Amino acid sequence: DFELDEFPDGFAEQIENLCNSEINADRQIEISFLARSEAVLDRDLIRTKVNLIPDTIEQIRVVDIVGLDKQADGGTHVASTAEVGRFEITKTESKGRGFKRVRFVLHDA
């Protein structure tokens, strides 16, 4: 979901091209851990509210999509972007004033 009044002309095609370009770049995914005290100092690293991370968590898992993005993340990840397969937008829709939704599928790599 996105906070947009309208989708710009050519939105779906442009997003598909950008996503597929990054997928085809075969960027490696690296996992590391940082002490919580270090991680919370980097606003780009933790993009959610720090208070949502339980106080008992002393090490923050960091996922680095090398050359593209690096952030705290506890989810499951592929080893490289090429494993994702081709990205295709199947539908764009309005979910109310200022809110848009993009539906997509991933085709086998």
Spans of features found by a protein language model:
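Active-/binding-site microenvironments in catalytic and ligand-binding cores
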Residues: 1-109
